[in-house]
């Protein structure tokens, strides 16, 4: 499973039981996921990401602050709300910034969609983080981030079709890989892919030409010294 890559279980008995899928193993797996969610919530809350603030984790039960709407009731999920184009654009922009902030904290949600984002009185709040992965330690992190961003685009694009032409995911990941991504990095929503296939013959010819030029340069230098 993509989410579990690079997650370590120190107890060898638990690890074997989880691998076999026994009752004890399933319980251990559930506890591990709860622990992973707690760790992710604390980490992201410290980074300023819009997630519910964890209050306590007692006997395997995670208590979090209530995410409320303007009336003080439990905030709805995005999939239960209809937006104007302006609202969709604004909420999409907010969530793209949160995805960036998460990535800068080293975390990829891994299952981000309209079903696990609440609309609080002051804006969207991201929930459901047991499957969050370490951006640097999981080989599937890039694919997960691209999927998260695509889910946001597809959902809000229903209300603001202009979003369907954006390409924030690859842009964000490229900046992250180059080590220049920060929560303040301006994004364009555009990304130029190199769709042209690489011609290995041309590449090898360029290498040979460079090698010949270097050999000629060395020969000239030797002739000058003589």
Q: Which role fits each region the language model picked out?
A:
Residues 132-142, 147:
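Activation segment/activation loop of eukaryotic-type protein kinase catalytic domains
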Residues 104-114, 119:
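Catalytic-loop of the protein kinase fold
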Residues 1-74, 100, 104:
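Conserved ATP-binding subdomain of kinase catalytic cores across diverse folds
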Residues 116-128:
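Conserved protein kinase catalytic/activation segment
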Residues 72-84:
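AlphaC helix of the protein kinase catalytic domain
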Residues 67, 128-133:
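Activation of the activation-loop gatekeeper triad in protein kinase-fold domains
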Residues 29, 83-89, 137, 141:
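Flexible beta-alpha connector loops of hexameric P-loop NTPases
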Residues 86, 94, 101-104, 125, ...:
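Regulatory N- and C-terminal appendages and interdomain linkers associated
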């Amino acid at each position: 499973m993509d989410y579990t890559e690079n997650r370590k279980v120190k107890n060898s008995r638990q690890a074997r039981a989880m691998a076999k899928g026994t009752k004890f193993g399933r319980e251990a797996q559930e506890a591990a996921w709860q622990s992973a969610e707690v760790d992710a919530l604390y980490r992201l809350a410290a980074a300023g990401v819009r997630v519910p603030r964890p209050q306590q984790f007692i006997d395997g039960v995670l208590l979090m602050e209530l995410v409320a709407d303007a009336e003080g009731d439990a905030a709805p999920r995005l999939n239960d709300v209809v937006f104007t184009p302006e609202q969709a654009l604004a909420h999409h922009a907010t969530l793209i910034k949160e995805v960036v902030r998460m990535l800068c904290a080293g975390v990829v949600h891994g299952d981000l969609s309209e079903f696990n984002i609440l609309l609080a009185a002051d804006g969207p709040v991201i929930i459901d983080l047991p499957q969050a992965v370490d951006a640097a330690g999981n080989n599937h992190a890039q694919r997960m981030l691209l999927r998260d961003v695509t889910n946001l685009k597809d959902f809000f694009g229903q209300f603001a079709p202009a979003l369907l032409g954006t390409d924030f995911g690859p842009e964000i990941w490229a900046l992250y890989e180059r080590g220049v991504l920060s929560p303040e990095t301006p994004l364009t929503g555009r990304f130029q892919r190199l769709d042209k296939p690489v011609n290995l013959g041309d590449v090898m010819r360029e290498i040979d030409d460079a090698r010949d030029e270097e050999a000629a340069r060395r020969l000239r230098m030797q002739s000058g010294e003589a």
